[in-house]
């Protein structure tokens, strides 16, 4: 819920945010956090993200698509618990879900809208390959991001659409 409440704060609690969480326990926790932070512009729903675009077509100016991922960015070599359940099958299953979520998010965006695609993983399949899929199949484009981040790395574009160099 921290991304949701941070966006509400950045918007000075003016506007509207629809936050969707599939997991019921996490959804209830998000509702609680939103309430405790006084983020009155946030409506929290609990539905499959793949259905959001169909229910809310051409509705949103901006979408933050924070997808479920393999979490490779959180692996600690010193802690086997952080990676013991990782598998290539899990990654492939997540890729299929991520594509469906991306399609739904694009459907929910107004024409000319902006979307941020977010993961906490490091692999190409869940990052560059998903965005490349969207460029080729969903009529989206990647815009350059001018933001100062410590240790920022450009996206990999070799073998993909050249605009992927603008991803971080």
Where are these regions (language model features)?
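S-adenosylmethionine
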Residues: 1-168
């Amino acid at each position: 819920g921290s991304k949701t409440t941070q966006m509400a704060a950045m918007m000075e609690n003016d506007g509207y945010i629809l936050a969707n969480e599939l997991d019921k326990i996490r959804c209830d926790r998000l509702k609680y956090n939103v309430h405790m932070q006084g983020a009155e512009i946030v409506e929290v729903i609990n539905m499959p993200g793949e259905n959001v675009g169909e229910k809310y077509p051409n509705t949103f100016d901006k979408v933050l698509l924070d997808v479920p991922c393999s979490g490779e960015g959180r692996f600690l070599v010193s802690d086997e618990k952080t990676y013991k359940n990782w598998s290539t099958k899990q990654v492939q299953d997540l890729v299929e879900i991520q594509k469906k979520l991306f399609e739904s998010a694009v459907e929910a965006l107004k024409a000319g809208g902006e979307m941020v695609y977010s993961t906490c993983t490091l692999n190409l399949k869940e990052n560059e390959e998903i965005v490349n899929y969207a460029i080729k199949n969903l009529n989206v484009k990647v815009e350059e991001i001018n933001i100062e981040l410590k240790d920022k790395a450009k996206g990999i574009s070799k073998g993909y659409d050249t605009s992927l160099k603008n991803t971080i």
